[in-house]
Structures are given as C-alpha cells and as structure tokens.
Regions:
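Positively charged n-region of N-terminal signal peptides that target proteins for export
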Residues: 1-4
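Bacterial N-terminal signal peptides
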Residues: 6-15
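Bacterial Sec-dependent N-terminal signal peptides
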Residues: 14-36
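Zn2+-dependent metallopeptidase catalytic core
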Residues: 31-149, 153, 271-300
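Surface-exposed patches in mature extracellular/periplasmic domains of secreted proteins
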Residues: 83-89, 160, 252-258
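Structural recognition of the beta-strand scaffold that forms the well-ordered cores
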Residues: 85-89, 155-158, 240-243
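Catalytic Zn2+-binding segment of zinc metalloproteases
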Residues: 150-170
Length: 300
C-alpha cells in the first residue's frame, strides 16, 4: 500500500497601513506575490498573503476558482509536484463562513466507489501535473487538529456510492423552527444520513438500533452528516471505500426510506419512522459500481 502525501499550508497576513490620496478609487489591484516559507520542523508551510488578498479569504475566496488556483500555483512555484492533498489552514480562531471545512476535488481515478466510470483530472488548472487529488480549506486553525480534517479527507472517497436507486442513503432536512414541525426527507448527498455506516460522514451505530414497532426506530444519538470531529474513527464501509480493507471485511449497511418524524421526535427523542428498511451488502455495492480499482493491496 502506498502512502498519501499531504502538505499543510497556514494562511496569514501582516496588517499594512498606508496613506493614499482621496482620488484613489480602489480600482487598482494590490495583489502581490505570495511568500511561502517552511517551518523548522518541516511539517507545515506558511503562506503570507497580501493585505489585499487575505481579507478575501476570510469571506469566501476558497470557492473562487481563480483565487484558489492562483494560490495553488504559488504553492507549486515553491514545491515539487509530490502532494496528493493540500490543506489550507486559515490562521484564525473564529470565522463567519458557513462551514468548518470544505473539500474541492481536483482529480480522482479510483473506480468502484461511484457511478463514474472514467474519473476526472483538473490538475492543470492548479499547477499540478496529474498528482493533486484535492484541496481542503479550514477557516479556523483548529480544523486539522480537532476536525473536520478527517471528515473532509473522507469526501475524496465518499459518499458517492450509497446515493441512487435502492442503494440511496436518506436524511432529514433539519431546517425547522418548532418541535412539532415535520422534517422533510432528503437525499443524504455526500454523507451517510440515517444509515448504519457510523463514520466520519455520519450514520448510527448498528449495535444500538432498536425497532419500536409500527415502523418506528431508534438508535444512540448520531449525526446524519458528521459524528464529532477527529475523535471519531472511520467507519467500516468508509475504510473499504478508502482502499484500506478488503471486501470480505465489510459489514452490511442498513438504510431507510420513506422517512418521517417531527423535529422533537428525531432531534430530541432520537427516533424516526421509515416505510422501508434495506440491508445493503458489499456485494450489492460491487454489483452496482464494480470492484474497487485499485483494490486494498494496491491502493494509496
């Protein structure tokens, strides 16, 4: 098994105070070259952004492909094209952005983990030549140590497998106001939702699942899209998708469909109604998506 190589880039800026004439309309860009240095321990690089660029990163520059790729190209002007993942870690203790971590895929050639039969490669836009797999941004400096770094890394392999047809993982739209409000069933998307995967991308512990009768179920408290930062290990099915264990070691996954519950029932009482309950084996996944290529003996 090959090892993944990750580089951690800490983003910061010095405050620059300058005087300008009243006729300065701000139309000229003050973007300057990014200065990158490596810490004495050799594990983390620091990128000093300009006083013009850095504020943009505090309000969402990561989702701007131009600004993101310009920064990545600066990284590759300092380093060889050897990294599988680049973690961009904002040197902040608080953030107003609506996420704790965000994964953006750059390339992926793993087969058997999604319905994609060709893979993709957009590395040419980043300064990499086919090596970089993804870039992940953490708005706060605790993102790597406490999470969601393991969660965001898992998005390279999932969830793209339990997402369609009779192998779809479902969840609830929890955007409600009152305890008696009905939760709406939604597709869990790139997370595990109300399923027994029990990993970084959500799901409950199957050993705690109980049938209450009348198609009602309960389990120990769990998250439908995350389960508690880096304190939570990867789930069994997640390890398979990552190429770390063989199919023979994968336990079945329980999925539910036709979900119903009020906000109080699900969020406070940890119970839900389901019209259907499905047990999915790794063989079901392989029949749908094909075998994982490379397998666990040759995966990275």
């Amino acid at each position: 098994m090959k090892h993944l190589l990750i580089i951690f880039i800490s983003l910061f800026s010095f405050t620059v105070i300058s005087c300008s004439s009243s006729s300065d309309d701000g139309s000229k860009s003050t973007t300057t070259e990014t200065n990158i240095s490596v810490g004495s321990d050799g594990y983390v690089a620091s990128a000093q952004l300009s006083a013009f660029d850095y504020p943009e990163w505090t309000v969402g520059a990561f989702i701007n492909s131009s600004m993101r790729n310009n920064l990545l190209k600066s990284v590759y002007s300092y380093f060889k094209d050897e990294f599988d993942f680049i973690f961009l870690l904002q040197n902040e203790t608080a953030s107003d952005l609506g996420y704790h971590g965000m994964y953006i895929g750059v390339s992926n050639d793993v087969m058997g983990i999604s319905e994609d039969k060709e893979g993709f490669d957009a590395t040419k836009y980043t300064g990499s030549n086919g090596k970089l797999k993804a870039v992940i941004h953490f708005p706060k400096k605790t993102g790597v140590q406490w999470g969601p770094s393991l969660h965001e890394l898992m998005h390279h392999w999932g969830n793209h497998s339990l997402s369609t047809g009779n192998l779809a993982a479902y969840s609830f739209d929890q955007n409600v106001l009152l305890p008696e409000d009905e939760l709406k069933q939604i597709n869990a998307g790139s997370h595990w939702g109300i399923s027994s995967v029990n990993g970084q991308l959500g799901g409950f512990d199957l050993s705690t699942l109980q049938e209450l009768g009348g198609n009602w179920y309960t389990a120990d408290p769990f998250g439908t899209f995350a389960n508690g930062g880096n304190s939570i290990p990867y789930g069994n099915f997640e390890l398979y998708l990552m190429g770390l264990i063989p199919p023979d070691n994968v336990t079945d996954v329980v999925l539910f469909s036709g979900l119903k519950a009020t906000a109080k029932e699900f969020l406070d009482d940890d119970k839900w109604y389901a019209e259907g309950k499905t047990t999915v084996s790794v063989e079901d996944v392989i029949n749908k998506l094909g075998s994982r290529v490379p397998d666990y003996t040759a995966s990275q």
